[in-house]
Amino acid sequence: ITLTAITIRERAVDRAIMGKKEGWGPDRILMMVSTDEEHHFANSGTTLPNYWAEAKRCIEKAKDVGIKLNGTVSTIWGSPISGPTRLEEAVEFTKRWLEIGAADIEHADHDGSAPPDQVHKYFSMVLDQIPDKRLHIAHFHVTRGWGTANCLAAMLAGIEIFEGTLGGLGGQPANFLDRVPVAGTGAYYYRDPNVVGLQSIEDMVVMMDEMDINTGIDVDRLLDLGTMMEKTIGRRLRSESILNRRIPKKLREEFKRKGLADLKKKLGEQPGQKYPTDWPEKSSYAG
């Protein structure tokens, strides 16, 4: 288990460092830039040039006490404030993070702005220029329902590390008050704060499991944790797999309609027979 603290500004980084020195601090911290400076300013309260200089100082201080710093890039596929952004600029921001010493990069769609084709295009660009897959983390919010599709698109481009939350919790930002997500700083640009969270880890892991991808996660235990999270929060969360569980792998007797075997026998059909006896074994249809 790696404990990560989100530390947007230097004061928070300093508190994390103090905690590490006292024996309780995080193993890893996160700072974030947005390619759209309006979005960045709304999130951090400062300019991009000033923030980059601050981040460089923080990386150096964190390294001195053994804390790794994750550099996050946001508004890669567009900004809810300024609109369209350029993928090429996000690749440049990624390089800048690594150049000043970030341990890894979170490529984030915090606002659900990424269509799957652009996700594949972006990560193909990134891996073409920075091929070490250990450096890249995909982070998709499900504001428009594209989360698992985007995970698949990123996987097809070559990404191997993904982030998710139980029940798809999170938002702008992912704050909790009395165990309930609350709105972030400033005007709230979503219509419903309950439908903006990070990709549901349950849905993502169930999908990967069905694709025979070994995640190393106990899928049934994960689904139980998701159910427990719903009880903790006190409402239905945004994981379809919590509700519907895994795809069945064996006959479910309780859902059978009675009488199939008797009807096949009455019609003179063999068990397992699926076509009339006078049909050829293979179809000759050629399109």
Which role fits each region the language model picked out?
Residues 1-287:
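Catalytic cores and adjacent flexible loops of soluble metabolic enzymes
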